[in-house]
Design a protein with these regions (language model features):
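Non-ligating segments of multi-cofactor redox enzymes
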Residues: 2-174
Length: 174
């Protein structure tokens, strides 16, 4: 998901299951989704997927996954979606909210690098960076100013919040 500022998937949802959050993430209320798939049809990036499986109680899964004890290993902050709803990357909204709440409870400012998504946390090369574009001192804001930065399908006008860098090529002639 590109977490667009002008997300075409948000406007077509008949039950308002998709909305735009304060941090710029495109969020879903999974318990509100009725699975019309309009959002998937309207997404120019084709990143939304329909959940065909019944994950909470599926006999195809290992016994331990359907056991009450086995279900306790799942992340309690992430909703286990039921069959018949649309799914997409949430940009780890639960981790973003936890970071904000923890800083608020401690009375601290949120510093650059405190926000982490699962993919950026797992990326050992540092190729994935997550942060606040409004903080001019942040690493992600500096990367945003780089001439090599681009957005996918910019001409569509969705104003995505996910950025990419062009591959570095040696342009010096011998």
């Amino acid at each position: 998901c590109q977490h667009c500022n002008h997300a075409p998937c948000e406007t077509v949802c008949p039950v308002a299951a998709t909305s735009h959050g304060r941090q710029g993430q495109n969020q879903m209320a999974y318990n509100r989704c009725v699975g019309t798939r309009y959002c998937a049809n309207n997404c120019p990036y084709k990143v939304r997927r329909f959940n065909w499986f019944n994950y909470p109680n599926n006999s195809e899964f290992d016994f331990n996954m359907n056991d009450d004890l086995g279900k306790m290993v799942l992340n309690p902050d992430v909703t286990v979606r039921s069959r018949g709803v649309m799914e997409k990357c949430s940009m780890c909204i639960q981790m973003t909210q936890k970071t904000i709440l923890d800083a608020k409870l401690k009375g601290e400012e949120i510093e650059d690098g405190m926000f982490q998504t699962a993919c950026s946390n797992a990326c050992t090369t540092g190729a994935m960076v997550f942060g606040d574009l409004n903080d001019k001192k942040s690493k992600v804001a500096a990367l945003h100013q780089d001439d090599r930065m681009y957005h996918l399908l910019e001409h569509v006008g969705t104003k995505p919040n996910v950025m990419y860098h062009v591959k570095v090529r040696n342009t010096d002639e011998v």
